[in-house]
């Protein structure tokens, strides 16, 4: 009797599971319309926060902006908004309500823009979306941004939702890791992943005693990215862009408190307490060996690279430590330059940039002509997400 039941359960189990690896089937991105040029930002920032008397600090901030390798960013908060909400401009004034009122509405809205583009590229009816993962470090609410997006897009009420709040900058890797497991464990699953970030939670005036907060003001930008994932694509209508081969997460040794964020009455405060680029570059080879050893790859220049651009120093030190050729981080640096650090959304923007450039330049695959690639997320913990990707022949994607 028991055997009969076991066989039955086994059969049900097999029917429930997909056969092949998860594929990225579409990517969409969106930003607010308000564009901020980095060259003009120090003047604007010190003027709008009534801090022009802090001339030494402004010089420091100018240097941070010059060294950031960022040309422009997009920000939802405008001068008008800041004039109406002066507490958001102060360094430490109770302003959580004003910030929440904005992000609770705008985070799902920006997410909808990115998701609509991804759904359009995918070309399938949105009723086929079975799972939704929504990720943001910008504001918290109940029911969450996942619920709001379900309503905004008109997804089925039975869509299975996962809401990730307050993960931080590594979460672009986290969402892919979770989406991979969902797609591969559920036959026919189509997972919509949305990362939407709006800096209204972290924006604040300068402080002499907290230069780490100023680093955030020089780097962070707004953006949302969406991807659709599924296993066993229907090649008559779906076009795979990348395959997800494996995904790992680890906490780096001796890195407690290296990056912290705290949600307070003053908004989300950002703290950098240790040498983050040093900690990441020191440990990155271990993550690569663990991920690529089983595949027999040890030449890091043979991979295409998607790394969360926390800041230019992280990219510089990783390149140096691994002996990477300059062009390896091209897509990563391009996104940093054009958008700044958009937290969890960055790596998905970089995936989009890479597949577009690869096709434009007539490369053989979506991964700059290469077969294997790596996607890295870095953030509070220090937490590192490592995703192994395989590209798709360019002919497939047309």
UniProtKB/Swiss-Prot annotation:
Listed GO MF terms = naringenin-chalcone synthase activity
Q: Which keywords does this Swiss-Prot/TrEMBL entry list?
A: Acyltransferase, Flavonoid biosynthesis, Transferase
The active site annotation covers 169
Q: Which CDD domains match?
A: CHS_like (cd00831)
Catalytic EC class: transferase
Give yes or no: UniProt keyword Hydrolase. Answer: no
Report the SUPFAM superfamilies cross-referenced here. Thiolase-like
Query: Which terms does the UniProt entry file under GO BP?
Result: flavonoid biosynthetic process; polyketide biosynthetic process
What catalytic activity is recorded?
(E)-4-coumaroyl-CoA + 3 malonyl-CoA + 3 H(+) = 2',4,4',6'-tetrahydroxychalcone + 3 CO2 + 4 CoA
InterPro entries xrefs: Chalcone/stilbene_synt_C (IPR012328), Chalcone/stilbene_synt_N (IPR001099), Chalcone/stilbene_synthase_AS (IPR018088), Polyketide_synthase_type-III (IPR011141), Thiolase-like (IPR016039)
E.C. number, please?
2.3.1.74
Its pathway?
Answer: Secondary metabolite biosynthesis; flavonoid biosynthesis
Q: Which PANTHER family match?
A: CHALCONE SYNTHASE (PTHR11877:SF14), HYDROXYMETHYLGLUTARYL-COA SYNTHASE (PTHR11877)
> Into which family does the record put it?
Belongs to the thiolase-like superfamily. Chalcone/stilbene synthases family.
Q: What does this protein do?
A: The primary product of this enzyme is 4,2',4',6'-tetrahydroxychalcone (also termed naringenin-chalcone or chalcone) which can under specific conditions spontaneously isomerize into naringenin.
Under which name does UniProt file this protein?
Answer: Chalcone synthase
The taxonomic lineage of its organism, from the top, reads: Eukaryota, Viridiplantae, Streptophyta, Embryophyta, Tracheophyta
